[in-house]
Swiss-Prot record:
InterPro entries per the UniProt record, alphabetical: DUF520 (IPR007551), UPF0234-like_C (IPR035571), UPF0234_N (IPR035570), YajQ-like_sf (IPR036183)
Coiled coil: none
SUPFAM superfamilies the record matches: YajQ-like
Organism: Xanthomonas oryzae pv. oryzae (strain KACC10331 / KXO85)
GO cellular component: cytosol
Function according to Swiss-Prot or TrEMBL: Nucleotide-binding protein.
Record-annotated membrane-spanning stretches: none
Taxonomic lineage of the native organism: Bacteria, Pseudomonadati, Pseudomonadota, Gammaproteobacteria, Lysobacterales
Transmembrane keyword on record: no
Record key words, sorted: Nucleotide-binding
Family according to the record: Belongs to the YajQ family.
The protein's name in its UniProt record: Nucleotide-binding protein XOO0711
GO MF entries: nucleotide binding
Length: 161
């Protein structure tokens, strides 16, 4: 039976490149001259933003979003933490979400069942496997999931015929 997987993943290499480009942009921007502002990537999952003031951290957020979009990374995978401010400066943690959570996977399955497509969906850890008898049914399922607006970016891979 034909099948495919629905995943929500971020290419770690592109993420590293985007963070490096954002740091280079901080070095060249006039409003960040002489300021200790930087992005740090930890374990490919968390981006730390630090600057002397919370206003500059907000500007850095815009820079980071622009660089991620330029590298083809959907910004819906980012989860911004609370702003931490003290006398030394301001910091914010940005978590990069990987995988589909159980609750979101159930929403995807419910959406497929609601459309009454002739496909079956199984939740396998942090991904969703969709199987059907015909390839056309799977293509309809892909079109439905692309059209539906979920708060996370979806990729479709491992298409087996």
């Amino acid at each position: 039976m034909p099948s495919f997987d629905v995943v929500s993943e971020v290419n770690k290499h592109e993420l590293t490149n985007a963070v490096d480009q954002a740091n280079r942009e901080l070095d060249t921007r006039f409003d960040f001259k002489g300021v200790q502002a930087k992005f740090e990537l930890e374990d490919g999952k968390v981006i730390n933003q630090s600057a002397p003031s919370d206003f500059q951290v907000k500007q850095m957020t815009d820079i980071l979003r622009a660089r991620l979009l330029a590298r083809g990374i959907d910004v819906r995978c980012l989860e911004f933490g609370d702003m931490e401010t003290n006398l030394a400066g301001a910091r914010q943690k940005v978590t990069v979400k990987q995988g589909i959570e159980q609750k979101q996977a159930k929403q995807l399955v419910a959406k497929l069942k609601e459309a009454k497509l002739k496909v079956e969906a199984q939740i396998n850890g942090d991904k969703l496997r969709i199987t059907g008898k015909k390839r056309d049914d799977l293509q309809d399922a892909i079109a439905l999931l692309k059209k539906a607006d979920f708060e996370l970016p979806l990729q479709f891979d491992n298409f087996r015929d």
